[in-house]
Amino acid sequence: MAKKANKVMGQVWGWGERLFGRDMEKRKMIFECLIRSVMMYGAELWGWKEQGLLEGVQARYWRWVLGLAKETPEYIVREEVKVDKLRVEAGKRTVRFEERVEGRSQCKILGECWKEIKAGKGGYGQRGREEYFRRVGYSVKAVDHRRREGIQMWKKLESRDRDVQRQERRGQIRESRYNPKYEEIITEGLPKYLSVEGDEEGKRMVARFRCGNEERANRYWMRDDERGCRLCGGEWESLEHLLRECDELREEVIGWKQVLGERAEGREWMREVVATRQRREMREGDGEG
């Protein structure tokens, strides 16, 4: 399924750029209508188990939309655009399907087929079912008991899974080595800079700064001498250095939390950083020529 989704995404990238440019809402619509529908095919049968490859496809798509670097962690990408893991939707579909099948007692063939699926191996059957219910804080017995009482559980289980994956994501952000600042700029809803119409390229620039792409100090996998400022060649290229210490930039009067805030108050300063880097690269290129 991941291969099919990647193929569709590859086709979408080309004409999506031509038709919609950087329009965030239209690209979200493309994902929902074309790519996600492919990834969710047959989820009623495999939705108990989280599919890491499919989650990776979704994160890759949103990195592309926001112009983020490939090393941006998936949990930061999902938090920035406020999208759930695909497992939430897949689990809901499986639970709803199970409830519909078990509610059709007159269809014996369908009932027997479903019993065999639940008893299957490889995470699609009983083990996957148990893991799913455990993840959302229920036992299989508790869910089955409530269903016998006529209570539909899919909405409650979907809500619980959404809360669980949100807690998991926030926990990963707290422990992040790549972007430890991000925890302090998390928003409860979609960041306001993404909600404003127009300036799509500006949104991508802000997203890169917020998600840690425009610093080198946080690239812990690089050598120390590779993490220096690209403008002045001095200290490690952190946001604090760029704001207060870099000789090639004017000292900014606001703090980094305001610069990275959801309203993008530091947008003009970000443009200055990007433009100054581009001018420096052009000078260095001319010098080499």
Name each model feature, range by range:
Residues 1-120, 128:
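Non-catalytic, peripheral interaction segments enriched in hydrophobic/basic residues
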Residues 23, 27, 49, 170, ...:
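Conserved aromatic-histidine-acidic binding/catalytic patches
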